[in-house]
Every structure is written in C-alpha cells, then in structure tokens.
C-alpha cells in the first residue's frame, strides 16, 4: 500500500509540471505546494477508507434532539455477536459454539462469510483468515484427579493416589466450507499418546439432512457416555457399559467414519483397524461399529433420547488376549478392579447396547445397557460380558443439561452465570448405579457401584468435580478375591480449551 501512495504523489506532481515550466514566483510556488499537499492528503484519505483503517465519521446529530443510544449486547459465550464479530451458533442454547471440526456446513459457511478474524466462546479463540477461507483453533484439556479409597478388607486397596486423567494439546481447523481436520495428543501418562487425528469433508444433501466423512485415528461413536469426551462426562469415570462393552482395541482405531445428521438425530458407521501403533508385522484386527440416536421429543426445555449401537470385530493374531480388569471405584486405584482372570485364545467379539433417557428443564436421566460376546478357540463356550447403569442429575442453579442433540451425547455447557462475571456458576448434583458381570467365565468376577457427586462449573470451560463411590466386588482371580466392599472419594479440577 506504501507503493500505491507513492505513485499517487508522483501523479500529483506530474500534473503540476506545466505550471512549473512557466517560472512562477515564490508566492505561486508556495500556493502550488499547498495545493499538491491538499490533493495528496485527499487521495490518502480515500485510500485509507478503502483499506478500512479509518473509522467512519459519526453522523451529525441535532443538539436539541440527541439520538437515543442502545446499550451494547452482553458478550456471552453463546451470543451471536461479540462486538462486530459473528460467533457460530451452538447446536443447543445450553452448549458452547462448536469448534471448526464439529461445525455443520451451514455454520461453517456463515462463519467464513462473516468477515471476522477472531471468535470467542469456548476457551481459546477460533482464528479466521481475512478472506474467510482458513480457520484454526488451538485445543486441549487438563484434568487433574485425587482419589482415596478406604473400608476395603484388603490394605492394598486402601490407598490415596493422584493422577492426570487427561493432559491434552492439539489443534483443529478448516479450509473453505467443506474440509476440516483435527489433531490431539495426550501426555497424561508422562508419554506421548496420539488420540484424535483425522481429516474430514462435510456437505448438505438437502435442507435438514447433512453428512460428514472422517478418516484417520477416530474416537468411538458407541453408547451415550462412551461417545462423550472425558472432559464432559457427568462423573469422573464413564459407566461400566462404556468401559467393559467395548472393542478389544479400545476407544480409538484408524479407519473411516461417515455420519448422517437430521433434525432429530444422527447415525454413524465406522470401519477401523487397530489403534496407532508400531506393529506392522501382522494384519490389524477389523472392527465395524454403528450407532444411531433419535429424539422423538425435542423442545426448548426437554428432550427424549433413544439410542442403539453395536460392533463386530475379527481379532488379529496379535490381539487374542481378552483379559479385562475394569475400573469400578476409581481410575487411579489400580488394585480396585473387576477382573475376568487370564483369558487367552480370542477369535472375534460382538457387542451391542441401548440408551434411553433425556431431560426436562434442569433434571436429566439416562439408562444404558450392553452385552459383549467373545468367541474363543479350542471349542470353548463364548464369554459373555453384561453391564448396565442408571444415571441422573439436577442443575440446582437452573441451567439446562449440556445435551448435544446433534451427536446424542454431553458436551461443554454454556454456564448462565459464570463466577468470573459475579454469578454462582452452575451447580449440578449427580447420582449413578452401575453393575458389571463377567461370571460366565469360571475365573470371572462381578461388581457394582453407587456414586453420588457434585459438579461445579465455574464457567463454560472450568469445572470442579467431587464423587463419593460405594463399590462392591467379588473377584475369582487375582490378588483381591472374594466379596469386598468399600468407599472411594475423588476430586477433579478440569479445564477445557
């Protein structure tokens, strides 16, 4: 732009050359210089206006009739505008706006065309290029836990531990309206673990019917809490339906996932191999996973949720060990598990489950159940795992549960009155019963747990959690066999950005 201004000044000087050829007086020269300076200043002002670097002059207002003023809209996380910046609309009023990799095609198109360079609303900002083509957002989460167990008949279970449930850092973004990507690593075990890492394409089939396709290292779409991120679960640990009725590869696998979205639900189909690893000596396991959810009732203050899911996997020759030690009273107490005992020689597994729940105003409830059938070598009978749970919560501050109607899971809440703005935050009371049964094996155990909890959301991305768990186990193998029961209390500080 400096070169344009210089050229403009030269044009003005050249236009004055004939006058200089007439050998003007000193007064004429001074007048000419003043005229040229005025012309150059006028041209520069026009260029500044084209660049948008100068503010528009306020309209004249009669002194006797001052124009009424309208106070600026409050800058809330879910607002459609923050100053002049357009913020992406959330999928529900009680949620924060989605990041670039979770937007539908209409949200992406609107944000790209808005002309904003920065959006705020979900922790760290979303950055846009000036032309609206490129979108970028840093992302991450910090979940710090402390837990203490007491009351067990085994001293080895009565321990107090600390840990990082998640310590993630990553990024997400998009190019244009349709292409998007996400990458995230976890450092919670004091080593690097790749979690989500994918690219995707989204589009609209017709009004009210969208799709996207993701390829890469994908998080399972399986069950209500199983599809909810670790930073959004209402309890410190997911239900045993999510942790026990699961493919052998775990929560992630490398593959492809097309998803279809309509106004009252969604469906997904996933085909994956193993997790990201360094073992390319044998073929991966093959896992096919599908899930669908439907909201037959969906209003501004209530939702009914119905969901079904299932998976089938053919196990690799390197993944035939099916031994399970499932969390029942706290992730960071390694002695507190429900165990299958040693189980070798797996050929394939099939799992399925159902979800039923919803919310009315600030109260929510969710029931989940599932089974997993493992087929074994050597003519042995199948191993059947069974799990179910019933959960509920009440936001005593009147906030709506952070239910995401697009995905059929919980998400980041939009807190009505954050403490950083002088409010109380959002306070939620929770309760859950869960039951797990591995006793179809001679060495398999069983267990159940009842949890009472409190979640205090300081704002939309900072949360304090407290859980009190009464657990009961009866293992037939391992160091802690026979009936045993006790208490585990846990606290968490969580920040998601």
Identify the role of each PLM range.
Residues 1-8:
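Bacterial N-terminal signal peptides that target proteins for export
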Residues 61, 81-98, 170-188, 255-282, ...:
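Glycine/serine-rich loop-strand microenvironments at binding/catalytic pocket rims
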Residues 118-119, 249-250, 347-348:
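A short catalytic or substrate-binding loop motif that flags glycine-/basic-rich loops and adjacent residues
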């Amino acid at each position: 732009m400096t070169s344009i201004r210089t050229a403009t000044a030269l044009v003005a000087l050249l236009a004055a050359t004939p006058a200089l050829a007439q050998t003007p007086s000193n007064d004429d020269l001074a007048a000419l210089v003043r005229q040229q300076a005025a012309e150059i200043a006028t041209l520069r002002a026009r260029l500044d206006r084209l660049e948008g670097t100068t503010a528009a002059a306020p309209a004249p207002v009669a002194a006797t009739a001052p124009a009424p003023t309208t106070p600026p809209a409050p800058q809330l996380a879910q607002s459609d505008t923050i100053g002049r910046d357009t913020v992406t609309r959330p999928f529900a009023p009680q949620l924060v706006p989605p990041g670039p990799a979770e937007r539908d095609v209409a949200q992406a198109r609107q944000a790209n065309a808005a002309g904003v360079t920065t959006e705020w609303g979900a922790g760290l900002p979303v950055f846009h290029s000036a032309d609206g083509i490129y979108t970028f957002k840093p992302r991450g989460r910090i979940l710090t836990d402390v837990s203490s167990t007491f009351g067990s008949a085994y001293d080895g279970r009565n321990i107090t531990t600390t840990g990082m449930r998640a310590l993630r850092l990553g990024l997400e973004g998009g190019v244009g309206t349709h292409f998007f990507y996400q990458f995230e690593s976890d450092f919670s075990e004091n080593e690097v673990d790749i979690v989500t890492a994918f690219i995707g394409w989204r589009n609209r089939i017709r009004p009210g019917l969208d799709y996207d396709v993701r390829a890469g290292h994908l998080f399972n779409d399986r069950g209500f809490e199983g599809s909810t991120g670790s930073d959004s679960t209402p309890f410190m640990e997911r239900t045993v339906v999510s942790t026990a009725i699961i493919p052998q590869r775990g929560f992630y696998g490398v593959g492809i996932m097309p998803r279809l979205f309509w106004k009252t639900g969604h469906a997904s189909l996933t085909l994956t191999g193993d997790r990201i690893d360094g073992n390319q000596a044998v073929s991966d396991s093959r896992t096919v996973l599908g899930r669908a959810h439907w909201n037959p009732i969906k209003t501004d203050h209530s939702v009914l949720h119905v969901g079904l899911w299932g998976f089938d996997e053919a196990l690799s020759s390197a993944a035939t060990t099916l031994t399970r030690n499932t969390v029942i009273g706290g992730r960071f107490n390694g002695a507190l598990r429900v165990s299958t005992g040693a189980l070798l020689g797996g050929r394939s597994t099939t799992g399925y489950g159902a979800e039923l729940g919803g919310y009315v105003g600030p109260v929510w409830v969710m029931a989940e159940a599932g089974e997993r059938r493992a087929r074994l070598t050597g003519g042995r009978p199948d191993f059947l795992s069974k799990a179910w749970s019933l959960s509920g919560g009440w936001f005593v501050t009147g906030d709506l549960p952070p239910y995401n109607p697009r995905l059929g899971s919980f998400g980041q809440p939009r807190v009505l009155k954050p403490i950083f703005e002088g409010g109380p935050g959002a306070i939620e009371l929770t309760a859950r019963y869960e039951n797990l049964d591995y006793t179809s094996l001679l060495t398999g155990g069983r267990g159940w747990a009842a949890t009472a909890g409190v979640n205090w959301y300081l704002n939309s991305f900072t949360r304090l959690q407290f859980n009190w768990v009464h657990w009961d186990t009866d293992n037939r193998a391992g160091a802690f066999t026979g009936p045993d029961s006790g208490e585990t209390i846990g606290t968490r500080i969580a920040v998601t950005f």
